[in-house]
Design a protein with these regions (language model features):
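The feature marks the mature, well-folded catalytic cores of soluble enzymes
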Residues: 2-211
Length: 212
């Protein structure tokens, strides 16, 4: 899977990548692989972004930086972005991250995302999120690569509401997330935004054996 993703990026001459939250790319260690190939990849989920800056691994599937205190996060930001004044104010730190990431979304050559549900009936990719970074990763760059395990494929679009209801409640206790994205194609001729090209990488990595 890593080689497939790299070849897609290479053919598009993509050197900078923004990435939405994706546990499956953690599974295949995509960041390290692309970094060794000379491609800059930036996490855009705020928790993942903080963990990446600290050169650490996510400690939780939903809240990747839950192991870090407010002071530790403040120090990470101060060390990496001296242009901003040191602060332990959570709202100010969030604003700083937003400013940094907005510029990266605008300039990135490609965006990589995970997938929560992939609908076989329509070819639709469903992405669940609260921060809006997933939407930016999948619409702002000219190239979008979605990476997902084969267990995320569902047969019909009508299957999604029930699964979405279970997902949000079990993950964060919410009735529904702030953003629910449905992507069925790259940008069409009469559309003014969205990626010019789109690829879906399906990962097995032992899943078929577990199913058997």
């Amino acid at each position: 899977a890593n080689n497939i993703i790299y070849q897609i990026l290479k053919e598009a001459n993509a050197k900078t990548v923004v990435k939405g939250k994706s546990m499956v790319t953690e599974e295949i260690e995509l960041n390290e692989f692309l970094d060794n190939k000379g491609i800059e990849i930036l996490e855009t989920d705020l928790g993942e972004f903080l963990v990446q800056l600290a050169n650490e691994k996510p400690s939780h599937i939903v809240m990747p930086a839950i192991h870090k205190s407010r002071k530790e996060i403040s120090r990470v930001f101060a060390d990496h972005f001296p242009e901003f004044p040191y602060t332990e104010n959570v709202d100010l730190i969030t604003q700083q991250a937003r400013k940094i990431l907005r510029d990266r979304f605008r300039l990135a050559d490609a965006g990589i995302s995970g997938v929560n549900f992939a609908v076989a009936e329509t070819g639709t990719l469903c992405l669940v999120e609260n921060e809006g970074n997933g939407r930016m990763c999948t619409t702002a760059p000219p190239l979008h690569i979605a990476v997902t395990g084969i267990e995320k494929v569902v047969e019909n679009l009508s299957d999604v509401p029930t699964l979405l209801n279970i997902l949000t409640k079990s993950a964060t206790g919410q009735e529904i997330t702030t953003y629910f994205n449905m992507i069925s194609s790259p940008r069409k001729n009469d559309e003014k935004d969205g990626p010019l090209s789109m690829h879906v990488v399906l990962l097995d990595n032992g899943r078929s054996k577990i199913h058997q």
